[in-house]
Amino acid sequence: MRYKKIHFAFDKKNDLILQKFKLFKKFKKYSPRNSDLIVVLGGDGFMLEMLKKFKKFNKPFYGMNAGTYGFLMNKLKNNNLLVNFSKSKIVTISPLQMIAKTKSNIVKKEIAINEISILRQGKQTASLQIKKGKKTIMKKLVSDGALVSTPAGSTAYNLSVHGPILSLNSKKLAITPISPFRPRRWRGSVVSDRSTISITNLDTRKRPVSIVADNVEFRNIKNVKIFVNRKIKFNLLYDSKNSLNKKIKIEQVRKEIS
């Protein structure tokens, strides 16, 4: 597909982007609403912000990396941009949806492209119960927390806490403990992406926890339900030689070797 109306969203805090942005000034400016493609210049964190910020416009996104790793991004290129955009392949992903309730019974809702993490809020470990539907997966997990990861996010925080890498087409979610103390050997669980996962804080008074959806945090959480929201779809564009699925496979090989 040929993309002509481009909206550029760039991280103004990124020095590399500020240096390179003059290369994109030749393009006519379009608002996100009137564009047919949103190009995001920055790192993974900025990409996640822009996906959420502009999701209401239902436009495809093409990320160009100026961050540290840029797993969700393409390489930052200067030449033949319109050709690169038109030749790129679309990957469609749906985010996780969290519906959490605080200790004060206030409902908090947020989506996450990578993962939703429940984390201890103070010096004491968290005490969590985890269910898949009505089935109890873990009656009591004493740990620094737990997370639920999508395939797209499985090589991020999930991998750093020894969670499994999921193929993009696996139709699975990873439930991964963070520094588990009891049971010490529990490595988590891989479940269908049709599952609804419930996590309850068993001791809100002595062991408060927060919840983080990608980069959005809520504190003093009592319980949360997490599921894939299929009503929301993000279309991400990737260069044919730099596909998201290829990146995930590379990480799988690295994990097997290490």
Predicted regions and their residues:
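ATP/NTP phosphate-donor binding region
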Residues: 1-37, 41, 46-56, 76-92, ...
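Short glycine-rich anion-binding loops that position phosphate/pyrophosphate groups of nucleotides
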Residues: 43-46, 67-69, 152-155
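Gly/Ser/Thr-rich active-site loops/lids in small-molecule metabolic enzymes
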Residues: 147-184
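Solvent-exposed alpha-helices and their adjacent loops that cap or buttress functional pockets
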Residues: 30-33, 90, 109-110, 120-123, ...
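Generic beta-sheet signal
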Residues: 62-64
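ATP/nucleoside-binding phosphotransfer catalytic cores, i.e., glycine-rich phosphate-binding loops
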Residues: 110, 118, 134-138, 186-258
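Proline-centered loop/turn at the N-terminus of a beta-strand
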Residues: 58-60
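Catalytic core of DAGKc-family lipid kinases
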Residues: 68-145
